[in-house]
Amino acid sequence: MSDAKLTAEELERLLSAEFPRMFDREKGVSILKVWHRGCLVRQGFHPRALRPGGTISGVAMMGLTDLAMYIAVLASIGWVPLAVTTNLNINFLNKPPPRALEAECRLIKLGKRLAVGEIAIRSEGERELVAHATSTYAMPLRSAT
């Protein structure tokens, strides 16, 4: 199930160095697993992610979704930090309780210029989805060296 171009440890090191405000283990983000065309990412619980009503905010879930997609793309094509989100569509299905979230991303298309992924978000330890998303990433042209 692996064949990833970068390991979880390599990705955590690179993301921490290049995007220290976005990716920070102190904020509870960790890459649990990567494989070619996918990953599993955990976002620890923090009270600032709550919205009125005591549930995790949509903003927090969208950020986790985008991060999982980025990690799946990088794990599959290697370190190409200029890959960018071109579309993200999310459906909020259930209210997540105030605890950690896990996002599993599976790339359903991986081309030379575009990657399309499906992301399932669950509360840690639960089977039922709290959100489901699809996303598209554009990759810069790579030189033919």
Regions found by a protein language model. Name each.
Residues 27, 37-39, 58, 82-88, ...:
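A generic structural signal for short beta-strands and their flanking turns/coil linkers
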Residues 44-68:
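Hot-dog-fold acyl-thioester-processing enzymes
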